[in-house]
Design a protein with these regions (language model features):
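Amphipathic alpha-helical interface elements
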Residues: 1-86, 90-97, 151-189
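Alpha-helix initiation/capping motif
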Residues: 65, 108, 138-141
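Short, surface-exposed, charge-dense and proline/glycine-enriched linear segments
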Residues: 102-103, 142-154
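Extended charged low-complexity segments that act as oligomerization/scaffolding linkers
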Residues: 114-115, 133, 140-147
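Acidic, Ser/Thr-rich low-complexity intrinsically disordered segments
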Residues: 191-193
Length: 193
């Protein structure tokens, strides 16, 4: 049985590490404010653990680091790695999955309204990214929830590892002018959310 307690989905350590790197650039910077993920009990179903991971990631993206999407929009913000486009794509895919899945699990979405059908379709598409040929959400088995949880944790951890590697490059960047532009944009983005 896989232990997910070290994943960003259930642990604040990666977020705190990114905050330390941001702070080392400039004492006014942070990446995520006050991330406190909810824990799961081993006795819970994998579906419940998956939902907890979704709620935690949503909180991380929307409550703690709502400006991250803005910072990742263009290469000339915080992204200094040659893999900047992949980081943007991974963020967009993960954010889309988290927001659509949270929407169907945490809101009263009657399927008799077209808007809710769109949300359900996006959620099912997100699940299909992690579990090809997945059944309807209500028919997913415990084994499939286990696979979904593992793949979600892996995708989130991989994304944040790439972001951390990028932060290492940014911290060691010798182009002071570029670094100062990035810091200014970062402060502006974080203060506007």
């Amino acid at each position: 049985m896989m232990d997910y307690t070290e994943s960003i989905c259930f642990s604040a350590e990666t977020a705190e590490e990114l905050n330390r790197k941001a702070f080392s650039l400039d004492c006014r910077l942070f990446m995520f404010a006050y991330y406190e993920p909810k824990q799961y009990r081993e006795a819970e179903s994998k579906r419940s653990q998956f939902l907890t991971a979704i709620v935690n990631l949503y909180g991380l993206f929307k409550d703690c680091g709502s400006f991250l999407g803005e910072l990742l929009k263009t290469r000339d913000t915080i992204l200094v790695t040659p893999k900047w486009k992949a980081i943007q794509n991974d963020y967009n895919m993960l954010f889309q999955a988290v927001t659509s899945l949270r929407s169907i699990f945490c809101h009263n979405n009657s399927l008799c309204y077209p808007l809710n059908e769109d949300v359900l379709q996006r959620a099912e598409n997100s699940i299909s990214e992690y579990l090809p040929n997945a059944p309807d959400i209500e028919d997913i088995t415990e084994t499939q929830w286990t696979i979904l949880l593992q793949k979600l944790c892996t995708a989130a951890d991989d994304f944040f590892q790439e972001l951390s590697s990028n932060m290492n490059l940014l911290v060691s960047c010798k182009d002071v002018s570029r670094k100062n532009r990035i810091i200014t944009r970062w402060i502006t983005a974080s203060s506007s959310c």
